[in-house]
Amino acid sequence: MDIKKIRLDFPMLNNKTMQGKPLVYFDNGATSLKPQCVIDAICDYYSNFTANAHRGDYDIAHKVDQTFDAVRSKVANFINAKDKEVVFTAGTSMSINMVAYGYGVKYLTENDEILITEAEHASNVLPWYKVAEQTGCKVNFIELDEKGRLTVDNLKKALNSNVKIVSLAHISNVLGYDFDVKEFSKLIHEVGAIFLLDGAQSVPHKKVDVKDLDVDFLVFSGHKMCGPTGIGVLYGKYDLLNKMDPLMTGGGMNTKFDMCGNIGYQHPPLKFEAGTQNIAGVIGLGAAIDYLNSIGLDVIEQREKELKRYAIKKLKEVDIITIYNDDNDSGIITFNVKDVFAQDAASLFNSYGIAVRCGEHCS
């Protein structure tokens, strides 16, 4: 891996901060920087072949159709899914809401349970609270161990025949711990529940194979994987997508409708993609996947682990720093400066050109 060459791919790293310092960007959990190839792909669409997707019957429109559909295939290959199982969304939050309202509200009743953890991002908590509010079902929490990790034993304690949905972050955005997804999937399916995996912090950093993991839904965002904002993915097993109601209705997602209120829906994934899609975002996502693949996810994962070990070693040399997750399997490092308010520490780092996230991290 040629790090100097890779750094040149990101225009923002060539800029100085407002304090005139070189940018040291450590906020990739919130959003990643964008390589020039992604920016170019978006600009190319806006400059050279702007048209709506699956609407027009002229050459430029056909090129948009082909490009749009090619990205769906690219995403499917990236996670080992089928094209028809890949739905484009506005991001992870929207993807979870689509499952919550399209499946949860439709099928859950007052005797049912949804399982999450207290370490989830707000986007994987609030939609389920709304499902509970509308259906009368209960949201319960899988207990974490003393370090904030998910364990098989604690999952077994929480599972029962009333559990219908389990929704978990593959990697927590705060502590960065991974867990045995395949074993969890097996146990969850044994009680007849469905399993949604929030891959916002995993898909950009490691290989995620939906068939191998046997998850029912996988959600993730483009902007955390070198892609643009406003684009995300909902993967769902096709039979489950077929059973779901669409969160939104509008042009392109219907086969027919009449004055009596009868509506015929397209088959998934088009059934969930009402109106004009974020075409530039889709194209940018495709370019981001190409970029990550050109480096190799295995290479990226290994490099992140090396950097994490180095950072932990250096942070431990500073007596006033407390690290909370030095043994996790991801590149997320959570720490405090003793007796210093987190926002004050972040402001100090900022004065040196160092960008970090502080506070509650949406959790």
Task: Place the predicted regions along the sequence by residue.
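Pyridoxal 5′-phosphate
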Residues: 1-363
